């Protein structure tokens, strides 16, 4: 490869990445998932597109995609709160194991019939497209404001269901290559190996990496590089040992993100850019790999297979997988069924048969790609609509314009939050002493226009003021309410109820006010929060609703695992 060729690659790569970034703004305007934009640009640059770039290097695509997935899952793990495991761990693991098997089996049987294949080859197609994709789920769920039970279940499922899909795919490829038609006891051994190595080495590697980062004295810019290189090392090591590198790197990130770590803010900020670059690069390469003309001959059966999986196989697997978990209501189960997003992982798995030289490998690849496109276009574009119809969107609290980590003490992660006050903020005209700031927070600076003011308690806030507040992450909900907009208060009332009650209120007092019909066995001296927990059972989350005694009770606020405020609304016939 000469210098001119290398420079041409740099030029083409830079143009494609820049075009992806610039055109990503059309995603929200058109209601199209941003991943589809990246895929489309790659396809336009490919053999059948305007660019005419001939790219059929499957090993290179496999390399780029796996590297990108490792970075995306490391970032996703760091941003997943360990508290979400309280409500979602076991349901997500059920979907990640039994759910994938059911989806793959049902989809594979229909694939064998639609494409006139042997049962085992049909099951291979089912295994390839059987898992949801972490990159797609993390990208499309971000900022949707779903209740914690649903969002955490979907995110943990997408980060942990790839081992089952990889295991099924590799096992079926080996069986087809060896001419076998039945499973042996080694099937279970390989499954345990995939999950076991992924969990053990992922957590051990994450712990060692955390220790190394906190012990080493480095330039601030090197900590993110150490974290990402360590995560990739964990991914590669587990994969080399025939474990699930995808699960390992996710758990590694989860451990890093939920323990005190040096330069946390810098690591997260760098990871954000790396994750975006990884998504762009991965979907560009996968788009280049596809020739749209190859999809036309299989379009009808592949579309039927996609609809079968989306409308029947995935919902059935979700309803079976969530049977033991009574805390999920019907609306949540239906929504989780709909968010069976497919993305890069099925396409990467479809490269395996190509590299193994199996018959019909091109068919497997094209079918997988078609299913991914249908999933992103059909499910991805309707995600917000489905969430609203299922009434799973919790009214958001105001987020700061920006947040900057101060990196003063890794055991106390102080940050600077910046809020800009527009005319619709209720606090306009209030004095600083009137603001009920969360305990431990301080207003560090107040900007008015280009001027830095020296405020006192009597300083009144004006439209356009910029407040710099020092606090910690757990202060964000209270700060968001403090600087909230008036319309959000009305939205909260529509969602949470006509009245928002303090959960510490005595049940006896609430009973007298609302005329509740309490059973004689009910302890009237308990608090409203304790009684609501009894009504819900399980692990409640903000937005959970239940009808009792002619009233709708909604959990409006929680502090850690404790219900702090409850919304009450009178049940009407219309509702």
UniProtKB/Swiss-Prot annotation:
What superkingdom does the record give?
Bacteria
Q: Which residues cross the membrane?
A: 3-23, 30-50, 58-78, 95-115, 122-142, 172-192, 194-214, 221-241, 244-261, 270-290, 293-313, 334-354, 363-383
- Provide the topology term for how it sits in the membrane: Multi-pass membrane protein
Query: Which keywords annotate this record?
Result: Antiport, Cell inner membrane, Cell membrane, Ion transport, Membrane, Potassium, Potassium transport, Transmembrane, Transmembrane helix, Transport
Recorded hits in InterPro entries, A to Z, give: Cation/H_exchanger_TM (IPR006153), FAD-bd_PCMH-like_sf (IPR036318), FAD-bd_PCMH_sub2 (IPR016169), Na+/solute_symporter_sf (IPR038770), NhaP2 (IPR023729), RCK_C (IPR006037), RCK_C_sf (IPR036721), Transptr-assoc_dom (IPR005170)
Question: GO terms for molecular function, please?
Answer: flavin adenine dinucleotide binding; potassium:proton antiporter activity
The main location class comes to membrane
> What Gene3D superfamilies does the record point to?
1.20.1530.20, 3.30.465.10, Regulator of K+ conductance, C-terminal domain
Q: Name one GO biological process term.
A: cell volume homeostasis
Instruction: Provide the reaction this enzyme catalyses.
Output: K(+)(in) + H(+)(out) = K(+)(out) + H(+)(in)
The answer to whether keyword Transmembrane helix applies is yes
Instruction: Report the subcellular localization.
Output: Cell inner membrane
Family that this chain belongs to? Belongs to the monovalent cation:proton antiporter 1 (CPA1) transporter (TC 2.A.36) family. NhaP2 subfamily.
The name this protein carries in UniProt is: K(+)/H(+) antiporter NhaP2
Give the encoding gene's name: nhaP2
């Amino acid at each position: 490869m000469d210098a001119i060729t290398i420079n041409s690659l740099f030029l083409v790569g830079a143009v494609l990445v820049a075009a992806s970034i610039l055109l990503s703004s059309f995603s929200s305007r058109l209601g199209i998932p941003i991943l589809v934009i990246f895929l489309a640009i790659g396809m336009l640059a490919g053999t059948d597109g305007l660019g005419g770039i001939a790219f059929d290097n499957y090993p290179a695509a496999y390399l780029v995609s796996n590297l990108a997935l490792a970075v995306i899952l490391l970032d996703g793990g760091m941003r997943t709160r360990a508290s979400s495991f309280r409500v979602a761990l076991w349901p997500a693991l059920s979907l990640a194991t039994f759910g994938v098997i059911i989806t793959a089996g049902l989809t594979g049987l229909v694939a064998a019939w639609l494409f006139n294949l042997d049962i085992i080859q049909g099951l291979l197609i089912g295994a390839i497209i059987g898992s949801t994709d972490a990159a797609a789920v993390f990208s499309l769920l971000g900022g949707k404001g779903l209740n914690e039970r649903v969002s955490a279940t979907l995110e943990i499922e997408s980060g942990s269901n790839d081992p089952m899909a990889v295991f099924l795919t590799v096992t079926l490829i080996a069986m087809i290559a060896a001419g076998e038609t039945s499973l042996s006891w080694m099937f279970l051994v390989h499954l345990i190996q995939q999950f076991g190595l992924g969990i053990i080495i992922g957590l051990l590697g994450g712990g060692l990496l955390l220790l190394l980062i906190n012990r080493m004295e480095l330039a601030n810019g090197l900590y993110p590089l150490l974290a990402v290189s360590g995560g990739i090392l964990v991914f590669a090591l587990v994969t080399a040992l025939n474990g699930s590198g995808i699960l390992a790197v996710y758990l590694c990130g989860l451990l890093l993100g939920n323990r005190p770590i040096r330069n946390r803010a810098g690591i997260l900020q760098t990871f954000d850019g790396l994750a975006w670059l990884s998504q762009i690069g991965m979907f560009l390469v996968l788009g280049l790999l596809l020739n749209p003309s190859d999809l036309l001959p299989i379009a009808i059966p592949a579309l039927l297979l996609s609809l079968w999986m989306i409308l029947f196989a995935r919902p059935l697997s979700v309803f079976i997988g969530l049977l033991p978990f009574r805390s999920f209501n019907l609306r949540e189960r239906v929504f989780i069924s709909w968010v069976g997003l497919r993305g890069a992982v099925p396409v990467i798995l479809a490269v395996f048969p190509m590299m193994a030289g199996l018959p019909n490998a091109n068919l497997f690849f094209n079918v997988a790609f078609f299913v991914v496109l249908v999933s992103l276009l059909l499910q991805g574009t309707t995600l917000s609509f489905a969430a609203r119809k299922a009434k799973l969107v919790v009214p958001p609290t105001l987020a700061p314009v920006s947040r900057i980590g101060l990196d003063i003490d890794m055991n106390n992660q102080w940050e600077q939050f910046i809020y800009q006050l527009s005319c619709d903020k209720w606090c306009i005209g209030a004095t600083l002493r009137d603001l009920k700031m969360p305990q431990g927070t301080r207003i560090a600076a107040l900007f008015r226009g280009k001027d830095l003011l020296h405020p006192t308690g009597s300083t009144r806030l004006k439209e356009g003021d910029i407040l710099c507040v020092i606090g910690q992450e757990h202060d964000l909900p209270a700060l968001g309410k403090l600087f909230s907009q008036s319309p959000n208060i009305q939205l909260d009332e529509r969602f949470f109820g006509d009245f928002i009650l303090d959960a510490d209120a005595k049940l006896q007092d609430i009973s007298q006010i609302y005329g509740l019909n309490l059973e004689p066995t009910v302890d009237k001296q308990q608090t409203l929060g304790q009684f609501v927990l009894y009504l819900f059972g399980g692990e409640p989350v903000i937005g959970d609703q239940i009808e009792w005694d002619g009233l709708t009770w909604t959990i409006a606020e929680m502090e850690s695992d404790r219900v702090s405020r409850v919304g009450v609304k009178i049940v009407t016939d219309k509702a």
